[in-house]
Design a protein with these regions (language model features):
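Beta-strand-enriched cores of mature, soluble protein domains
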Residues: 2-234
């Protein structure tokens, strides 16, 4: 019996199995801000909601189930799970289904659109969809920190599925009757630093997977904050 051959074959099989196992990356994000019903434009709605002290926040775990597909795919699609808490919508609402997309403009990492879509049901039993986007530009003419930490949001009537246009923000015209309300959420600096420590992985090559995801998600900010998310491979 050729023991060496058996050991070599077993090692090869194990290596192939490891390579076939997708590596996932996940992190937890918390954003807070203000939201008001009866408005459609996030910026003006934010000011109105702030005066009224109509608060909104969410805590979401964003997951890329397969880092290879997430990085190479056109839609860079992941999942979002967690909850949203809104004064205007009746309190804390669990996310029934959630999407996260990161669209890279023309393959240029200096311009990215991050999109969030959450299906929720209000305390009164109404189905609604939370949609939000960050427009992130790394060029010197824009405030990169503000872009990365600001989410413009609307809440739509019903459970609305994602559209086919991956480059679109997901928000509707402010005058669209489907828009129930709008506002703006932000990440505070200390919360952002805490967010960077929540990165986890499953599967092989965890440290490399986090670096690939982080570079795509944060662009130039990754060189500053990526050290907080470092993970040593076992």
């Amino acid at each position: 019996m050729d023991t060496n051959a058996d050991e070599t074959a077993a090692a090869s099989t194990a290596s192939e199995a490891a390579n076939a196992t997708p590596t996932s990356v996940a992190f937890t994000e918390q954003m807070t801000g203000f939201f008001v019903l009866g408005a459609g434009d996030p910026r003006s709605a934010y000011e109105d909601a702030r005066v009224r002290d109509e608060r909104m926040m969410f805590e979401l775990t964003i997951t890329a189930p397969d880092i290879d597909e997430f990085v190479s795919g056109d839609e860079h699609e992941g999942t979002a799970a967690g909850y949203l808490d809104s004064d205007a919508l009746g309190g804390r609402l669990p996310v029934e289904r959630g999407w996260f997309n990161l669209f890279v403009q023309s393959g240029d990492l200096d311009e990215r659109i991050m999109k969030y879509r959450l299906w929720l049901t209000t305390e009164g039993g109404s189905a609604v969809t939370f949609v939000g986007f960050k427009d992130v530009r790394d060029d010197p003419g824009f405030d990169l920190w503000d872009d990365t930490t600001t989410l413009f949001v609307q809440v739509l009537d019903g459970h609305v599925p994602p559209g086919a246009d991956v480059a679109a923000t997901g928000l509707l015209d402010p005058a669209d009757p489907s828009v129930l309300g709008a506002g703006v959420l932000r990440i505070r600096p200390l919360d952002f630093a805490e967010q960077m420590t929540t990165f986890t992985t499953t599967g092989p090559g965890g440290a490399q997977a986090i670096a690939r995801f982080g570079g795509l998600f944060l662009g130039r900010l990754w060189s500053t904050y990526g050290r907080l998310a470092r993970q040593d491979d076992a």
